[in-house]
């Protein structure tokens, strides 16, 4: 499936403030982005997921005008990223895994340096974030651990009350306790921000995201609300009579199918109670029991990634 599939909810559609249309990025003979198309509505938390090399960081860099697209259109707040100005940048907070921070300054000194650039800077919010994330304001940034530097970047990205917060692999290399602290502090302070987050830590994303886009080999395989994705993907166990045979071929929406003894297991990517039972009993003889279990974002991703690689999506 080469084009993104947008699955919309029943709520009133928000304004799209981040968008890409037929976006391509070439590095020599390598196409990092291949006709990428998607949009992010204001007030949503959009998780950009995909395997290493899928193009997640490249997408973010094009949106931020850190890379020029080879062709196509990328825009933030309706302004093409090629023409993004300090006015638009002032409405964006940005945190990345390898973000450069001035190591010679203390946390407090760096915050004091940033404040004059943002008339909307909220000192009360800054203070509460320093407290919640337990950041040592008097320590030099170069002396902080990796986790503390990521926390510092987050405290620098939110107090000016941006409309859009971009997080590029913010949890990479952090131990579970620091990740939990970071996610907890972030969720308390994010408010009504629009968020674009790219991360391999899918369990953390699941607690933040309202929408998800699955990127593979530079293409958006699908884009939809998180609630819809977790509703339509179920792990299914079909118990058959001992003499029953598993039919072939199986429906294309049944991924990662395997049989263990008299139990057929698969992931149904178009699940509904009524259609699953009807389809299973039509295809399989001797059906004794059908069980469908919810899946985490991580388990969905580990099923969809190989399917995308093999051209099964």
Language-model segments: what does each one mean?
Residues 106, 225, 293-296:
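Short loop/turn segments at beta->alpha junctions
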């Amino acid at each position: 499936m080469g084009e993104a599939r947008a699955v919309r909810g029943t709520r009133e559609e928000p304004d799209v403030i981040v968008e890409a249309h037929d976006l391509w990025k070439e590095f020599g003979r390598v196409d990092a982005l291949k006709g990428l198309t998607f949009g992010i509505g204001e007030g949503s938390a959009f998780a950009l997921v995909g395997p290493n090399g899928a193009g997640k960081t490249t997408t973010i860099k094009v949106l931020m005008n850190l890379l020029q697209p080879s062709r196509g259109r990328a825009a933030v707040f309706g302004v093409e990223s090629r023409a993004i100005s300090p006015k638009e940048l002032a409405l964006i907070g940005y945190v990345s895994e390898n973000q450069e921070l001035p190591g010679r300054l203390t946390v407090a000194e760096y915050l004091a340096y940033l404040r004059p650039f943002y008339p909307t800077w909220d000192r009360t919010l800054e203070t509460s974030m320093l407290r919640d994330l337990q950041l040592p304001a008097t320590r030099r940034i170069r002396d902080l651990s990796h986790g503390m530097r990521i926390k510092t970047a987050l405290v620098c990205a939110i107090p000016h009350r941006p409309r859009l917060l971009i997080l590029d692999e913010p949890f990479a290399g952090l131990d579970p306790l620091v990740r939990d602290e970071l996610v907890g502090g972030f969720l308390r302070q994010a408010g009504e921000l629009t968020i674009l987050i790219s991360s391999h830590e899918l369990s953390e994303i699941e607690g933040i995201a309202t929408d998800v886009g699955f990127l593979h080999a530079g293409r958006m395989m699908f884009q939809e609300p998180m609630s819809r994705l977790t509703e339509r993907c179920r792990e299914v166990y079909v118990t058959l009579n001992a003499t029953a045979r598993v039919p072939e071929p199986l429906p294309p929406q049944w991924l990662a199918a395997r049989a263990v003894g008299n139990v057929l297991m698969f992931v149904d990517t178009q699940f509904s109670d009524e259609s699953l039972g009807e389809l299973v009993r039509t295809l399989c003889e001797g059906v004794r029991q059908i069980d469908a279990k919810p899946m985490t974002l991580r388990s969905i991703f580990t099923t969809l990634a190989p399917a995308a690689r093999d051209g099964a999506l």
